[in-house]
Amino acid sequence: MNSVGRRGPRRANQNGTRRRRRRTVRPVVVVQPNRAGPRRRNGRRKGRGGANFVFRPTGGTEVFVFSVDNLKANSSGAIKFGPSLSQCPALSDGILKSYHRYKITSIRVEFKSHASANTAGAIFIELDTACKQSALGSYINSFTISKTASKTFRSEAINGKEFQESTIDQFWMLYKANGTTTDTAGQFIITMSVSLMTAK
């Protein structure tokens, strides 16, 4: 009887100590302070990196890429950079409606040829910073229709040194191909950097 009585308390003590040890282990496994630390650091880093692109209370810089497709060997037209840029709704119907002032600081115009090697002719472009021309007046800048090439224009050439109202165009780019057929020529792929100021 005594031996049975001794075994009983020992088991109870062992169970008690085991339960206590399990309870003490639980808060060690859940390391909440360490998890909270990295989350705050990551949150701060995201806030710093995305401030200019998410909130942008005072402005920022965006890069837009768009294309002008189905150019023919005898195509002509005008691309109006600003609120009239229908080829890039992300700019004309998007970001410019959220800011009072903007400036396009650079553009890269790539003519991507889809023409055959036998297609003759060239496509000329001209920058109009007065936004008044209705037809091409200069034939200095050109692309050979049968070859892919690109040209880059900085702020000095596109009236991009000063901010202006988001309700007016900054410049136009006129183009004209000198071919005599409607053969496929290619497309323009245009990349531009836009600075923004004063959110609405």
From Swiss-Prot:
Transmembrane segments: none
Comp. bias intervals (Basic residues): 37-48
Database matches in InterPro entries: Luteo_coat (IPR001517), Viral_coat (IPR029053)
GO molecular function terms noted in the UniProt entry: structural molecule activity
Subcellular location: Virion
A Pfam family assignment: Luteo_coat
Main location: virion
Region described as Disordered: spans on this chain: 1-25, 33-52
Keywords: Capsid protein, T=3 icosahedral capsid protein, Virion
GO CC aspect terms: T=3 icosahedral viral capsid
Keyword Ribonucleoprotein: no
Recorded family membership: Belongs to the luteoviruses capsid protein family.
Role description: Major capsid protein.
Additional facts recorded: The N-terminal region like those of many plant virus capsid proteins is highly basic. It has been suggested that these regions may be involved in protein-RNA interaction.
Protein name (Swiss-Prot/TrEMBL): Major capsid protein
Native source species: Barley yellow dwarf virus (isolate PAV)
